[in-house]
């Protein structure tokens, strides 16, 4: 009996030990350390989720075994969506930090909106005469004294300085080639309105003319492009009234631009942000036009972060208090905040890596610190988003009806003198202390902030995706019979006209930017499936070019399954049309440029503007009931694996950049 008791005791001890250690052995690596927030009762900062390590396929294995059939209950897709709408809802992807953009089903509340601060300044001022990049001047922000203590031809006081290099180079605001890309990115992100920064009473009419015409062009093609709001500043009253009159004349009075008005409260009343004294002057004016302004416009009030008064119906473009305050449903989310007014003050300002650590008991305001190691994750911006995401849906409808993001493309600030020797900038400084969402080539920033913005817009403003039915259909791949393709709900659109030739001057200096890599301008992608194959019908704006021997960048189809694991190349498991022979293409399982293995053949047929590709499900590890993939189509993108930012700047990519389309969710 004693022996039996001893055995049972040992077994019980063994089971207790296994219970303790098993969570530690459930994955091959421990989660990444998050910032220390032990001083807080709760941690309001959302860190990028970390991927658990997965088992790498054994040597010589071309494809993991087909997973067991998932149990997914699907429903008919009765939504009446255009291809453009379907595309925006089915954006997907995963960034280097493991953050995920998931497809969505539609807006939770059609009366909530996301706005973006949009700037028009580059190349428009007399001090925009050269290219001065603070990140390069300070050797990737490692020697700040090179900027703050010197006034030389390398970094002259009084000149506008870039905080870093934009993905399209140091571009001029009138470069329509760049502007087309911007409109595409903002539309695909789900941004509802642009707020034009004219707060210094400069209207940049040569820039806005290009912007408005391009917005109208894409709107006429069926894209739900962002609408437009002007943001006017407070200076001399008479001068401010004159600026208001001019804005009315060049934009709001023109019938051609009426479809670009942002009208959230009344379809006949465009929103405009104006100083409180200008609005009051119109209400009291005896001037006929000014009296009409009072009833014509939906006014919001210009709100500066340093003002003592929070205006009724205010529209803050930044908030120095955390959590941010709502002003009659308008709340600002900024990537960084220059709370000491001097963004060069890297101790006092809140950079991209700032996160809240402790809440003051009396005011409820949070204090925090800058994480100089993890600023590329935009911890600050995520904390700003969390202010909204932590609200209930009812609170969001009341306090976050207008989520206003600062900002998209500011890029420059004037170098100013502080005393005899010190120099500074006000609004933006270096990559860590900058507030642009537009992708950058500086200091490893890439497009992380843009990616995170889409993720949060999806989480905030949209309902989770639904498992819809994708009825089986088998097209004849030997001809372009559009009949069967028309039965598919899964038709995705790409912007066209945005991959033409580029030839425009930089913001300053003698540099001229040129690009002629645009070749096949991708228009639509329609996907079908049956019990054995996936089918893709890709159309371009013009006839698809013939494949040339040795061209690995011709009409590539990149694929990632829902069960992707192990090493991926640029985030993708498979590529089609990397190796083409006649009407056949190898389906390459790709781990790196030096490790590509064929897992089968795809059929590829071209019919003028259309290409039809047939891929065996089995080659991708998929099956009749398990066919979820993310995909991207690219043409002539240069060196995309080593430099994925080239997906924004060379050839054509559908969808743009590091985004994918989702099929079969």
Model-derived features: where do they sit?
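N-terminal, intrinsically disordered, polar/charged segments of Gram-positive cell-envelope systems
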Residues: 32-71
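Residues within well-ordered beta-strands of beta-sheet-rich folds
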Residues: 117, 197, 229, 526-528, ...
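Sec-dependent N-terminal signal peptides
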Residues: 5-17, 25
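Beta-strand-rich interaction surfaces with strong enrichment in secreted/lumenal proteins
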Residues: 523-526, 599-604
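Glycan-processing catalytic domains of CAZymes
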Residues: 69-474, 552, 598, 624, ...
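Surface-exposed, glycine/proline- and aromatic-rich loop segments on solvent-exposed faces
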Residues: 475-584, 636-645
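Sec-dependent signal peptide cleavage junction
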Residues: 18-37
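Ser/Thr/Pro-rich, low-complexity mucin-like regions
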Residues: 607-653
């Amino acid at each position: 009996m004693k022996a039996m008791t001893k055995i049972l005791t040992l077994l019980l001890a063994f089971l207790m030990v296994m219970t303790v250690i098993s969570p530690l052995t459930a994955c091959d690596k421990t989660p990444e350390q998050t910032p220390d927030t032990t001083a807080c009762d709760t941690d309001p900062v959302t860190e990028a989720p970390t991927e658990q390590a997965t088992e790498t396929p054994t040597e010589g294995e071309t494809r993991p075994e087909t997973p067991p059939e998932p149990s997914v209950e699907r429903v008919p897709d009765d939504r009446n969506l255009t291809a453009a709408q379907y595309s925006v809802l089915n954006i997907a992807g995963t960034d280097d930090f493991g953050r995920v953009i998931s497809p969505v089903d539609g807006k939770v509340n059609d009366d909530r909106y996301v706005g973006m601060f949009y700037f028009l300044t580059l190349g428009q001022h007399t001090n925009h005469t050269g290219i001065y990049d603070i990140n390069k001047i300070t050797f990737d922000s490692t020697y700040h004294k090179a900027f703050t203590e010197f006034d030389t031809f390398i970094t002259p006081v009084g000149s506008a300085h870039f905080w870093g290099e934009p993905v399209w180079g140091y571009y001029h605001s009138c470069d329509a080639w760049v502007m087309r890309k911007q409109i595409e990115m903002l539309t695909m992100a789900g941004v509802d309105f642009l707020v034009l920064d004219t707060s210094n009473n400069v209207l940049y009419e040569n820039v806005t003319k290009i912007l408005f015409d391009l917005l109208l062009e894409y709107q006429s093609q069926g894209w739900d492009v962002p609408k437009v709001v002007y943001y006017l500043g407070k200076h001399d009253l008479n001068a401010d009234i004159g600026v208001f009159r001019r804005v009315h004349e060049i934009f709001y009075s023109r019938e051609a631009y009426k479809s670009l008005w942002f009208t959230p409260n009344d379809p006949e009343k465009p929103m405009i942000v104006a100083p409180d004294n200008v609005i009051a002057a119109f209400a009291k004016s005896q001037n006929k036009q000014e009296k009409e302004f009072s009833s014509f416009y939906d006014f919001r009030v210009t709100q500066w972060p340093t003002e003592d008064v929070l205006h009724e119906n205010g529209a803050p473009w930044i908030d120095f208090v955390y959590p941010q305050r709502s002003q009659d449903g308008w709340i600002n989310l900024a990537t960084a905040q220059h709370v000491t007014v001097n963004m060069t003050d890297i101790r006092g300002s809140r950079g991209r890596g700032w996160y809240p650590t402790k809440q003051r008991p009396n005011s409820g305001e949070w204090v925090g610190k800058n994480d100089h190691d993890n600023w590329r994750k935009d911890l600050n911006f995520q904390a700003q988003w969390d202010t909204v995401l932590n609200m209930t849906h009812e609170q969001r409808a009341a306090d976050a009806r207008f989520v206003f993001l600062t900002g998209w493309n500011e890029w420059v600030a004037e170098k100013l003198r502080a005393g005899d020797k010190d120099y500074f900038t006000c609004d933006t400084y270096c990559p860590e202390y900058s507030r642009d969402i537009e992708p950058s080539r500086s200091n490893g920033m890439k497009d992380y902030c843009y990616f995170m913005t889409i993720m949060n817009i999806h989480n905030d403003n949209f309902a989770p995706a639904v498992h819809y039915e994708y009825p089986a259909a088998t097209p004849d791949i030997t001809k372009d019979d559009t009949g069967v393709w028309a039965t598919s709900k899964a038709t995705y659109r790409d912007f066209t006209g945005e991959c033409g030739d580029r030839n425009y001057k930089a913001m300053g200096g003698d540099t001229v930017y040129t690009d002629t890599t645009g070749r096949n301008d991708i228009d639509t992608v329609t996907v079908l499936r049956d019990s054995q194959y996936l089918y893709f019908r890709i159309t371009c704006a013009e006839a698809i070019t013939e494949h040339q021997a040795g061209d690995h960048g011709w009409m590539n189809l990149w694929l990632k399954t829902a069960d992707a694991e192990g090493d991926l190349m640029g985030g993708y498991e498979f590529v089609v049309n990397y190796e083409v022979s006649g009407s056949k293409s190898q389906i390459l399982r790709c781990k790196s440029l030096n490790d590509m293995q064929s897992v089968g053949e795809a059929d590829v047929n071209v019919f003028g503007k259309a290409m039809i590709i047939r891929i065996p499900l089995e080659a991708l590890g998929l099956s009749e009931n398990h066919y979820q993939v993310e995909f991207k189509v690219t043409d002539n993108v240069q060196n995309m694996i080593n430099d994925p930012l080239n997906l924004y700047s060379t050839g054509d990519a559908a969808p743009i950049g590091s985004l994918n389309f989702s099929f079969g969710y």
